[in-house]
Regions:
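Charged, terminal alpha-helix-loop-beta segments
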Residues: 1-131
């Protein structure tokens, strides 16, 4: 993600009235001087994700953002999206929200394989926790 992002937390807890809110991933972008709320979804984009993100951004701006910082930004990452549906869902939103997709792969790229241990080594290390 680059050197301009600072990790703040995962499942970051906020309150809205008496309701608990949990943001999947909260980052801070140094150059933008903005909090970045990221929501990870396993399926296709749904309009209610935008409403929930607006709630998160409002709570962040009221409770966490410092006066000298810019408004918080939301990113919703889904497995798939219908571009027109996303545009309609975000059309009247005043909050900066983006929607992105991800792709799953069955194999790791070659350069990443070199960085990770073999599956047998991972299994061996995990057995330590079973004991």
């Amino acid at each position: 993600m680059g050197g301009d992002y600072t990790y703040i937390g995962n499942q970051y807890h906020l309150m809205a009235g008496n309701r608990d809110l949990y943001i999947d991933l909260l980052l801070f972008h140094r150059r933008l001087r903005s909090l970045i709320a990221i929501e990870l979804k396993i399926g296709e984009f749904e309009a209610e994700y935008a409403g929930k993100m607006q709630l998160y951004l409002s709570a962040l701006d009221e409770q966490v953002k410092l006066p000298e910082e810019n408004p918080s930004i939301g990113i919703i990452i889904c497995k798939s999206k219908d571009k027109t549906y996303v545009e309609y869902a975000l059309k009247n939103s005043n909050s900066p929200i983006g929607v992105a997709t991800y792709k799953l792969r069955n194999t790791l790229p070659e350069d990443m394989k070199e960085m990770l241990p073999e599956p047998e080594e991972i299994a061996k290390r995990l057995r330590i926790f079973e004991e």
